[in-house]
Amino acid sequence: MSVDFRDLIKWRDNMANIAAEMDQIMDELVVGEGVYAVKQAKLICKNDVPDIVGSGDYRNNWHSSDKAIRNGRSYKVDVFNNLSYAEHLEYGFRSHFVPGHWEGNTFVYQRDDPEGGMYVGPYKGFVRGRFVLRRAIKRTKITQEARLKRKLNRILQERLNRGL
């Protein structure tokens, strides 16, 4: 009586290859979560009432890094907005006077403008932040477990079927 171990050996080799590629797989999953968080941030910017910023620059400047950062057994990815005023929209700011003037429906900033300017926010008050990044991360974490399981199962099935 004999036993054919060829398929079992192929399966063992496939598992060894998957184990060797695990850093690459985890990187792909984590970067995908960053992309999902960016999509959520853009959706929040688009659908928030009242509108966050009219021009769309704030919405279009959300990005995530294309490489995951490993720290021990955990991974992270950066999600960011590099606009100069992004931090002020995220966390809020003190009310202040802005020199300049109106030309039609557009405010033109001009330092030491003799025509005056406008006061942003309530007098001696605080303009509350919109917390877009915080809300996007919260939305991402709500569905993260199911999304990661689905992606990981798909990746593992592809890699296991590739070798058989």
Q: What spans do the regions from the language model cover?
A:
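Short helix/strand-capping connector loops at secondary-structure junctions
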Residues: G121-T140
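Short, low-complexity, charged/polar segments at coil/turn and helix-coil boundaries
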Residues: D13, N17-Y123, R154, E158-L164
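Acidic, low-complexity proline/glycine-rich segments
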Residues: M1-I9, D112-G116
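C-terminal or internal capping secondary-structure element at the end of a domain, subdomain, or sheet
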Residues: A136-L164
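Glycine-rich, flexible loop/turn motifs
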Residues: D4, Y85, R128-G129
